Amino acid sequence: MEELGLKSTFPYEYGSDFTMIRTEMLNTTKSETTILFSNIKSILAIIWKYSFTFLRSFSDSIKLIIDDVVTIGSRNFAERLQIEAKKNNDQEDIWASTIILGVIIGYLISSIKRKNTFPIMPTSSPKIDDCRFKTGDTISIVINFNEDCLNNRSDVTEERNYEESTVLHSKESVLSIGRQNMVTLNQSDENFTYGNFDEYDLLTKDYTTEVLTRSPGSNPEFKAVVNNTLLDSANETPFKGIEKSINETMVKVPMGCDVSLSHYGRQYAPGNISIMRSFTARDNTKSVSREIRDICKSFLIIKSQFGDELFLTMFMEKPVFFDNNIPIEITGAYREKRERLDEVIHKDLIRYDEVQNLTRIRNLLRVKSQKICSRRHNSSVPTKKLLVNDKGATSILLWYSNYS
């Protein structure tokens, strides 16, 4: 501070404790303010002094360079090419001035380039080869649509088989609820497994309990395996209706389960399959294979964890639970069809609640939304056509693993 000519009257600067009366405080503040402005003036004077010196030196250098250029330009051709040093006394000054001027110009150009250059961050989305959903304390809601893919078929026989295969899922609204064993999806969407579930049709009030599965080495011919403790004379009619619609025969085989499955979702046989359909996705000649292949191409999954039973408002602008404002994200290629699905709405789910004698839940722990992750070829994705009629919304499948 002394070198710059600055002063200080702050007693606490040296670490001494002091007490002042009001008059002393005012006088000290006044003197401190005066010294502060004096120091500011000294600093500004120093800055101006060195700035003026720098500007004067810079102007002298520019003037020297200009004089050298004019001097060289005024010489004749013979003097410009002279080699002897004694006749070229100002050559060193010229080179030095030229180098300084080049450095200044280069620095200015590089500064302008740095201001106009912005780094571009690489953006790349991760690619997921496959996605697997395994058993857990979650509920999965599968919304299955019957996509009209007849535009891509030229063979009349294939169209007839396709129409026959969709008879089972041509109802206006179907709700299914039951237990989840495992759901697996791979790149080709060939692995497709359900757990136990009870299917209730809102229109016909029929019940079915079945599972769709495909395992390595399975018989390409369609077959159904039914638990003999479940199938009795009271509920055998729905299975006959399925046999008639898909033109196949179900085979009754015991599965080693001695616990009957309740249609009202209150009792379950843990870890056992009541009905199994084995199929091969590559077998395009079979109606069931065609049906399953179309199902694999056109459904979406929403997962959530719950306390008792599930109640949903679906196909709304922002779907929420009845007693909870927790949103559910509808994923997939069929979000634009929400306004056309008038047959499967809030009132139908309440009707299903009354028939099944379920109790509404007041507390949902948490909700998770899970997209179907699979890489498909563009040609295998069904077309995004709007539904032609209300029967295009074929089924809603709900299954869960256990109560929390």
UniProtKB/Swiss-Prot annotation:
A cellular component annotation (GO) from this entry: organelle membrane contact site
The name on file for this protein is Uncharacterized protein YBR063C
* Magnesium as UniProt keyword: no
State its location(s): Membrane
Keywords from the UniProt entry? Membrane, Transmembrane, Transmembrane helix
UniProt GO BP? organelle localization by membrane tethering
Q: How does it sit in the membrane?
A: Multi-pass membrane protein
- TM ranges are 35-55, 92-112
